[in-house]
Amino acid sequence: MFSKGMEIAGFDDELWAAIQEEERRQEDHIELIASENYASPRVLQAQGTVLTNKYAEGYPGKRYYGGCEYVDIVETLAIERAKRLFGADYANVQPHSGSQANAAVYMALLKPGDTVLGMSLAHGGHLTHGAKVNFSGKIYNAVQYGLNPETGEIDYDQVDELAREHRPKMIVAGFSAYSQVVDWQRFRAIADSVGAWLMVDMAHVAGLIAAGLYPSPVQIADVTTTTTHKTLRGPRGGLILAKANPEVEKQLNSLVFPGIQGGPLMHVIAAKAVALKEALQPDFRHYQSAVMENADAMAKTFIERGYRIVSGGTRNHLFLVDLIQKGLTGKLAEEVLGRAHITVNKNAVPNDPQSPFVTSGIRVGTPAVTTRGFGVEECRLLAGWMCDIMDCPGDETVIGQVREEVTHLCRRFPVYAN
């Protein structure tokens, strides 16, 4: 038998040290990667429960194993909360990730070789939207749309032209690095004009949508997918939503299980249920509003300091800083900011002359710093410090000064207060 007093510390000190160091890094560094956030202690608690022991292949009420009466309650809570939060008629909470949720949709609605029209990775799309290195670009005939070079916004005329030329079976809307509001209805009209399915990947803005601060695609698209972390602030995982269509719902369920997954991760589904309940609370809207205000304040500070923001600003939680005119690579910017304990990710920008491993931009997002309690004042300061470093990336004195400021700010705003 096991004692409940068993701990990793003292048994696997090497592993425990790495975990402790990562916890310190999260407390002592400022996190600006747009896809990262901090899960609440309640979400972390759910992931550490005995639910991890239970196999539950199938769906609530239709399992292939016995002893599922309690995990059925857990999964049903998650499903009903997801439907309520997003105004969906259908929800599948079993996908282990956003990419697996997307894969299930592809396999449910398409056949290998079918044409898919999605956003180019270089213009802000995601790997699963048709990138050649991904299953979506290998198994399917992927055609890519991008941004209007003059406005920096999605080129809907190009989407329309490509749809009429290639007659895709499915159009994918959504992004991983786009700072404006997507016109879901325009995508719907284009999809209808060529008889295509419309899938929306709202992973990055799910929290904003849940709070009613960003247009919802859920009753516009045929199927909507998301992750449950990022702005939703839950565990790492995926979620599929849809408007009422019994045939599509049946296909989606069978493609998640047994199509691409076996047993669901019940401890993660429990954590999803917790996060969804947190997102249903009134203060969640205040949090998401602050996320957007902070992103806007940072973007405007960069612009004031002479940096170019792709699409001219932000109307969500993130933005891309184009460093081409500064003669700076995204890789170097990520490195020097990291030395000051500011974490960002290098990111390709439209017409990027650098490779994806180097890039000419950085992506900046405010979900994590807002969870810590940063407001507009702190975010303006932070953006200014970042500009100080990128203005003279080889100046260790500046990096050291900013690192001190970061240390003081992190101590004022701990992630997990004692």
Swiss-Prot record:
Which molecular-function annotations from GO does this UniProt entry contain? glycine hydroxymethyltransferase activity; pyridoxal phosphate binding
Q: Top enzyme class of this protein? A: transferase
Sequence intervals crossing the membrane: none
- UniProt cofactor(s): pyridoxal 5'-phosphate
**GO cellular component terms listed in the entry, alphabetical order:** cytosol
Note the CDD domains from the entry: SHMT
Q: Does the keyword Transferase apply?
A: yes
Q: Where does (6S)-5,6,7,8-tetrahydrofolate bind?
A: 121, 125-127, 355-357
Cite the record's note on assembly. Answer: Homodimer.
Family note: Belongs to the SHMT family.
* Protein's name according to its UniProt entry: Serine hydroxymethyltransferase
Tell me the gene name.
glyA
